[in-house]
C-alpha cells in the first residue's frame, strides 16, 4: 500500500512514477505534471470508491520516480518505460496492423497512383490512411473510372507498343502511346489529387473551365471527355457521406465495462469517413487516464497523425500530448472535446461504434465459452481450454524439415503467438524425433511464456506419446494433451475416392479414439486448429525450400549480395536464363561489374575464365583477335549454350 511516508520527499515537478510490487516488479507506470500531488492521490487514506483502483494500490510495495524538465519529456519517458517493463496495469498496445496510403509523385512524368505502407519524406503526395489493402484497392478502382491514369510503372508503360487493356475499358488514357498530351494528363493527375483530398468543388471548377475552354476552341472531343469526367465525379460525390465540414481528423469513442475498455477510431479525410478501427484492452484505472495512455501509445506506433484529434472526454495535460504529436507530424496538431455541431455528432458515432464492438465481442465470447465447455466435456478436460496450441512437422524425406506452432485463444487464432521452428538436431526422416525437438524447444526456451491449457498434435497415438514423454521429462504440469489423426481416404485404381474414414481424436490413457460426431462443433474446432498448423508449417517449408533451391547457385559468389542476386533474377527472369547468359550479357545487367560477372560465370560453369587482355591488345597479345582460322578457339569466351563451357571436374 502507498503511504504518506513513501511520498514525503517526492518533488512537485513533472516526471514519471513507477509503482512496484513486493518482488520489485513494476506493475504500473504513470506521468504527472506534479509528481507529489499525483502519487498522493493513491495514498492509503484515499477514499476512492473504485474497487479496481483500491485493489491495485494494495499491491504496491514501493514507488520510484524520475524527474523531467517538461510534461512532454514525461510523456516520452512514460511511453519508453511502459515498453521496457510491460507493467500489468498499463495498456500494452502492440498493434501489428499496417495502414495503407495512396502515393502520387507529381514530379514524375505522367504521375501514377500506387498503394504503399510507409510514408517517407520524399516530396510525393500521400492520401489516406486506409485500414486495409482491400479498401485502398477499392478506392483506386473507383478513381480510375473518373481519372484514367496509368496503371503500370513508368518503364513498363513507356515500353509498350500499343495501349493496354485498361485503355480499352476507358480506365487508362494511354500516355504510353501518345493518346493524351502531357498537359491534359497533368490536369487528370491534379484532379485525382484534389478529389482524394475531398476538394470536390475545386475539381468540378477545374474541369468545368477546361470543358468550356475546349468548347470555345472547337476541341469537341476534349470537351466531351471533361463533360464525362464531371458527370462521373458528381455521381460519386452524391454517394459519399460528408460527415464533417472539411479537413482531416481522427475521432475516438470510448465504451467502458468494468476493467475492460473498448475504443473505436474513425478516420475522417477531406470531410469524408474513409475507415475505422476498434481496440480492446484491460484497464483498471480512470477512463480519462486510459484514453490519454492509449493516444500516446497509438500514435507512437507510426500511425498517421491528422491535424485534429477529437475525443469524447477531457484528458490530463493535453497540451503536452499536442506538442509531442505536432513534433512527430511536422505540423500543428490539436486535441479537442467537441461540445456541439457535426464534430460532436462524429464523436457520438464513434462512441456508438465502440459500444457495438463491445456487444459483438461479448456475443462471441459467450459463443466461444459454450464451445470450449462442450470440448472440455467431450475430451474429459478439467476445465475449458482457453489457450490451445497445435504443432505440426513438414519435410521431404527428412530434408529441409521445419515445425510450426499455432495458438488459439478463446477459440480464435492469435497470429502474434505463432512460432516457426527449423529442425536442427534430426538428420534422418523421423517425424517423432522432430516433434520431440520442437516440443522440447518450446518448453525450454519459452518457459517464461504462458502455458497452454491443451496441446494438440497432428497425429495419432505415436505423436501423442512423444508429447506426453516431453511433458513428463520437462516436468510440465497442468497441460492437457490430445492427438488428432487425419481421416484416411481409400481410392480405386482410377484414383476415385471410394471411402473416407473419420477424423479421430486420441487422449492419453486410451487405446481407442474418442467418439465424436464428425459435424460436431468441438471436432470442427480441433480440425480447424490442426489444419491451420499444417498450413503454417507447409508455408514455412516452401519458403525454406525455395531459398535453398533458388539461392544456392548464386549465394557465395564474390561481389554478388542479396541486392545483385535479386536484380539478376529480375533482369533475366529466372535462374535458368542467368545460367545461359554470356559474360557480356551478365556485365550489362543492372548494377553488375565485370569482376562480379566473371566470378559468377566461373561459379556456374565450374572453371576459371581467361584473364581479359590488356587495353589495346587482343587475346593473342599482339593486337589480333583470336579466331577459328588461327586455331586458338580455346582462348575465346565460351558460348552460353553449353557447347564450349569448361567442364566441371
UniProtKB/Swiss-Prot annotation:
Its main location: cytoplasm. Residues 12-91 form the GIY-YIG domain. Pfam families: GIY-YIG, HHH_5, UVR, UvrC_RNaseH, UvrC_RNaseH_dom. GO terms for molecular function: DNA binding; excinuclease ABC activity. GO terms for cellular component: cytoplasm; excinuclease repair complex. GO terms for biological process: nucleotide-excision repair; SOS response. Belongs to the UvrC family. The UvrABC repair system catalyzes the recognition and processing of DNA lesions. UvrC both incises the 5' and 3' sides of the lesion. The N-terminal half is responsible for the 3' incision and the C-terminal half is responsible for the 5' incision. Interacts with UvrB in an incision complex. This is UvrABC system protein C. It comes from Geobacter sp. (strain M21).
Amino acid at each position: 500500500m502507498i503511504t504518506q511516508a513513501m511520498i514525503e520527499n517526492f518533488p512537485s515537478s513533472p516526471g514519471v512514477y513507477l509503482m512496484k510490487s513486493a518482488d520489485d516488479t513494476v506493475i504500473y507506470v504513470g506521468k504527472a505534471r506534479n509528481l507529489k500531488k499525483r502519487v498522493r492521490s493513491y495514498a492509503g487514506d484515499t477514499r476512492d470508491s473504485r474497487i479496481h483502483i483500491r485493489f491495485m494500490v494494495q499491491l504496491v510495495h514501493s514507488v520510484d520516480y524520475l524527474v523531467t524538465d517538461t510534461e512532454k519529456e514525461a510523456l516520452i519517458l512514460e511511453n519508453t518505460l511502459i515498453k521496457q517493463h510491460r507493467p500489468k496495469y498499463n495498456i500494452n498496445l502492440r498493434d501489428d496492423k499496417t495502414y495503407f496510403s495512396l502515393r502520387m509523385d507529381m514530379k514524375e512524368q505522367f504521375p501514377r497512383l500506387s498503394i504503399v505502407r510507409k510514408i517517407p519524406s520524399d516530396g510525393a503526395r500521400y492520401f489516406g490512411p486506409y485500414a486495409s489493402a482491400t479498401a485502398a484497392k477499392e478506392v483506386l478502382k473507383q478513381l480510375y473510372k473518373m481519372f484514367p491514369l496509368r496503371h503500370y510503372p513508368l518503364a513498363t508503360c513507356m515500353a509498350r507498343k500499343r495501349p493496354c487493356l485498361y485503355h480499352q475499358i476507358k480506365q487508362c488514357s494511354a500516355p504510353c502511346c501518345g493518346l493524351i498530351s502531357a498537359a491534359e494528363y497533368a490536369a487528370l493527375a491534379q484532379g485525382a489529387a484534389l478529389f482524394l483530398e475531398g476538394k470536390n468543388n475545386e475539381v468540378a471548377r477545374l474541369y468545368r473551365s477546361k470543358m468550356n475552354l475546349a468548347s470555345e476552341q472547337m476541341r469537341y472531343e476534349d470537351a466531351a471527355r471533361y463533360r464525362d469526367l464531371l458527370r462521373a465525379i458528381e455521381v460519386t460525390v452524391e454517394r459519399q457521406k460528408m460527415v464533417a465540414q472539411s479537413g482531416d481528423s481522427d475521432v475516438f469513442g470510448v465504451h467502458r465495462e468494468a476493467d475492460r475498455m473498448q475504443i473505436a477510431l474513425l478516420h475522417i479525410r477531406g470531410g469524408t469517413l474513409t475507415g475505422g478501427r476498434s481496440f480492446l484492452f484491460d484497464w483498471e484505472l480512470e477512463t480519462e487516464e486510459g484514453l490519454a495512455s492509449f493516444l500516446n501509445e497509438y500514435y507512437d506506433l507510426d500511425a498517421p497523425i491528422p491535424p485534429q484529434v477529437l475525443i469524447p472526454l477531457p484528458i490530463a495535460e493535453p497540451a503536452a500530448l499536442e506538442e509531442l504529436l505536432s513534433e512527430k507530424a511536422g505540423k500543428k496538431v490539436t486535441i479537442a472535446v467537441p461540445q456541439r455541431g457535426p464534430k460532436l455528432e462524429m464523436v457520438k458515432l464513434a462512441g456508438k461504434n465502440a459500444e457495438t464492438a463491445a456487444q459483438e465481442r461479448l456475443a462471441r465470447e459467450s459463443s466461444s465459452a459454450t464451445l470450449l465447455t462442450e470440448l472440455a466435456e467431450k475430451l474429459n478436460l478439467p476445465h475449458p481450454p482457453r489457450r490451445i496450441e497445435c504443432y505440426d512437422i513438414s519435410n521431404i524425406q527428412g530434408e529441409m524439415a521445419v515445425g510450426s506452432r499455432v495458438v488459439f485463444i478463446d477459440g480464435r487464432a492469435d497470429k502474434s503467438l505463432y512460432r516457426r521452428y527449423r529442425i536442427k538436431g534430426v538428420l534422418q526422416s523421423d517425424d517423432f524425433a522432430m516433434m520431440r525437438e520442437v516440443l522440447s524447444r518450446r518448453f525450454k526456451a519459452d518457459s517464461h511464456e504462458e502455458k497452454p491449457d491443451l496441446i494438440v498434435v497432428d497425429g495419432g497415438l505415436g505423436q501423442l506419446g512423444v508429447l506426453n514423454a516431453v511433458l513428463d521429462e520437462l516436468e510440465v504440469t497442468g497441460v492437457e494433451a490430445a492427438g488428432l489423426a487425419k481421416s484416411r481416404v481409400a481410392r480405386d485404381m482410377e484414383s476415385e475416392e471410394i471411402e473416407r474414414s473419420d477424423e479421430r481424436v486420441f487422449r492419453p490413457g486410451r487405446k481407442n479414439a474418442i467418439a465424436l460426431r464428425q459435424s460436431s462443433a468441438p471436432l470442427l474446432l480441433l480440425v480447424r486448429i490442426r489444419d491451420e498448423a499444417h498450413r503454417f508449417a507447409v508455408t514455412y517449408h516452401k519458403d525454406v525450400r525455395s531459398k535453398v533451391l533458388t539461392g544456392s547457385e548464386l549465394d557465395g559468389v564474390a561481389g554478388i549480395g542479396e541486392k545483385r542476386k535479386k536484380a539478376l533474377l529480375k533482369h533475366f527472369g529466372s535462374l535458368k536464363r542467368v545460367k545461359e547468359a554470356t559474360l557480356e550479357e551478365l556485365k550489362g545487367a543492372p548494377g553488375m561489374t565485370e569482376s562480379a560477372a566473371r566470378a559468377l560465370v566461373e561459379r556456374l560453369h565450374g572453371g576459371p575464365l581467361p584473364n581479359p587482355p590488356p587495353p589495346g591488345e587482343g587475346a593473342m597479345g599482339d593486337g589480333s583477335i583470336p579466331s577459328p582460322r588461327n586455331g586458338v578457339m580455346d582462348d575465346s569466351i565460351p558460348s552460353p549454350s553449353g557447347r564450349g563451357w569448361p567442364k566441371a571436374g
